[in-house]
Regions:
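Glycine-rich phosphate-binding loop of ATP-dependent small-molecule kinases
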Residues: 1-187
Length: 187
């Protein structure tokens, strides 16, 4: 089963994806992790990525889509993908549709974690201390949140009319959000 988890930065997409990986034995496709991995490797792509992230901007679709393509066409992961933070733009959503069609797959569930700005700030401040992520300073997060609102709203419109779309209250506690997801998945 292929699943999309999307919502603003700090919504808990990664946390919920990790739960689903354990329950379903699926693979987490975290664009954030993939991008940070490129930065760690100090590749040319990694250097481009860091400039986007430091400016609070989304990384160019072409870069992100190329990383996603490798995962979608990995036969060992077919039908077992949990997309965490992808797609973020209409171009990415359409690219994902195309890749899945070409690889004879589909999205089974789309979960939108709807979270208010105050909750996000609290979560990011906590995550900054616990995980020491460089992209978690408040100014960068606020820029990413504003970029998210402008860029990802059309993606919400794109998916919200689909039968397998579920809007969840992402302001709830982690276990409550997880229960909502498990209920929809009938787990």
């Amino acid at each position: 089963m292929n699943i999309i988890l999307f919502g603003p930065p700090g919504a808990g997409k990664g946390t919920q994806a990790k739960f689903l990986v354990k329950i379903l034995n699926n693979f987490q496709v975290s664009t954030g992790d993939m991008l940070r991995d490129e930065i760690k490797k100090d590749t040319d792509i990694g250097k481009k990525i860091i400039s986007y992230m430091n400016d609070g901007k989304f990384v160019d679709d072409e870069i992100v889509n190329s990383l996603i393509e490798k995962v979608v066409f990995d036969s060992s992961k077919k039908g077992k993908l949990i997309f965490d933070g992808y797609p973020r733009t209409i171009a990415q959503a359409k690219n994902l549709d195309l890749l899945l069609t070409e690889s004879k797959q589909q999205i089974d569930f789309i979960f939108f974690l709807n979270v208010n700005k105050e909750t996000i700030i609290k979560r990011i401040e906590k995550r900054k201390v616990e995980e020491r992520r460089g992209d978690d300073d408040l100014d960068t997060i606020l820029k990413r949140y504003d970029t998210y609102l402008k860029t990802t709203s059309p993606v919400l419109d794109y998916y919200s009319s689909k039968q397998n779309f579920y809007k969840l209250d992402g302001n709830l506690e982690i276990d409550q959000i997880n229960k909502q997801i498990r209920d929809f998945l009938k787990l």
